[in-house]
Design a protein with these regions (language model features):
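Charged docking surfaces used in two-component/phosphorelay signaling
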Residues: 118-183
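N-terminal Rossmann-like NAD(P) cofactor-binding subdomain of oxidoreductases
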Residues: 1-130, 134-137, 161
């Protein structure tokens, strides 16, 4: 079944989990097409993470952000369809631990992640130069690791999520020569 055939897929499902390998603008259009077809979308992709009325949810931390779905439905003209996203995989390891510490006024966080090649969607067969190698900078990952927690810790105002301004997060994301797993 072709994931881009929204009409055909829509006949067979009640909702979709979206984890496709496409350009961001194509993913955004595809997810909106599903939502507009009244099919709820839970996305693993980053395309809609910064859409103001799309909740980026870690349920035990910010389930109140789900209330923006009503504003999103108005924008999309839907009754049932919506898009919700999960955050970057690396921040799911440290945001739950940091969240209770926010009440103590932490001002700065320094985070370092060690990410397997699977996080880049690759294997050693496809990326032999990674064998016995470490890449000390992963383009785009540091920005996600520094900014996405602020959306998760943000507040809902007028149907949009306004990101928090603190703590300031500095991240270093390193690609390591292991097949699966992030630390």
């Amino acid at each position: 079944m072709d994931a881009q055939n929204v009409e055909e897929v829509g006949k067979r499902v009640d909702f979709v989990f979206c984890a496709v390998n496409m350009k961001k603008d194509e993913i955004k259009a595809l997810e909106e097409a599903y939502a507009k077809a009244e099919i709820p979308v839970v996305s693993n992709n980053s395309a809609n993470r910064w859409t103001p009325d799309v909740p980026m949810v870690i349920p035990e931390i910010n389930d109140a952000h789900l209330e923006v779905i009503e504003a999103q439905r108005k924008r999309l003209g839907t009754k049932r369809g919506f898009i919700a996203v999960k955050p970057n995989c690396s921040i799911q390891s440290y945001v739950p631990m940091l969240t209770p510490l926010l009440k103590f006024g932490i001002k700065e966080v320094v985070a370092t992640t060690y990410q397997a090649i699977s996080g880049a969607g690759k294997t050693f067969n496809e990326w032999p130069e990674m064998i016995d190698n470490v890449i000390p900078y992963i383009g785009g990952e540091e920005e996600k690791s520094e900014q996405e927690p602020l959306k998760i810790w943000g507040e809902v105002e007028n149907g949009q999520i306004i990101k928090a301004v603190n703590p300031i997060i500095t991240a270093q994301c390193i690609r390591v020569p292991v097949t699966n797993g992030h630390m």
